Design a protein with these regions (language model features):
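Short, conserved micro-motifs composed of acidic
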Residues: 1-224
């Protein structure tokens, strides 16, 4: 969907360029130049098992056959919701892999010189809890991380939180971004504009059209 004259156009199906008979794919994220697409594919042939992370390169108006991102990141459990940093050097994602704090955690991997990915690092106790953390979104500034959590104190269900990295890459204690962005329902997924002025979330709060809807709002101090 394109934003034209202060409104969104009717959604169009992405031209993937490959025959899509696979069971499930989603949580798409693009590199800054728009030429690499990262996404989740579940129970695909040749996968590590469960849901894995994949990437695809653009070729004009279509997308080339996807590539599994590899077993340095993917496991036999569940990896999902990739987000690439604006410089394409860091990949954040959610995973239920061994070695976490419990439930699904948020992890980070660094792109190496040979274009492979380093073994991922758990983002630690300031972000991950014994319950579920998921849906990471790294702002274009490279230091502001948003995510959904059931483990940190919240208003109900999943809430959205923000953490910021210092000069040494240490993440601050997660902060609930508050009402009215969070509600008594579930808020999962947030995207903020490059200029930091607007954000979009998905929520199943009361008053929507059913299940999860997308909401748009102007940012406030707790956001940026």
């Amino acid at each position: 969907s394109d934003y034209i004259d202060s409104s969104w156009s009717k959604p169009k199906v992405v031209n993937l360029g490959w025959k899509d008979e696979r069971l499930n794919m989603g949580t798409i994220n693009f590199s800054t130049d728009g030429r690499t697409m990262f996404f989740t594919g579940c129970y695909w042939p040749g996968s590590q098992g469960g849901c894995d992370l994949y990437f695809s390169k653009s070729a004009g108006s279509i997308w080339l056959e996807p590539t599994n991102i590899g077993n340095s990141i993917n496991t036999s459990t569940w990896e999902s919701q990739p987000i690439i940093s604006s410089d394409s050097k860091k990949l954040f994602f959610a995973s239920k892999r061994a070695g976490g704090k419990g439930g699904s955690d948020i992890w980070m991997s660094i792109k190496l010189k040979d274009n492979t990915w380093s073994p991922p690092v758990n983002l630690g106790d300031s972000i991950n809890t014994s319950k579920d953390e998921m849906a990471p979104f790294l702002h274009a500034d490279g230091n502001t991380l948003f995510f959904a959590s059931k483990g940190h104190p919240g208003l109900g269900g999943y809430d959205l939180f923000v953490s910021r990295a210092d000069a040494l890459g240490r993440w601050s204690l997660a902060k609930n971004i508050g009402y009215p962005t969070n509600s008594l329902g579930n808020e999962i997924n947030i995207f903020s504009s490059i200029d930091g002025k607007r954000s979009w979330i998905s929520s199943d709060r009361a008053g929507g059209n059913g299940n999860y809807d997308i909401y748009e709002f102007d940012n406030y101090n707790e956001i940026m």
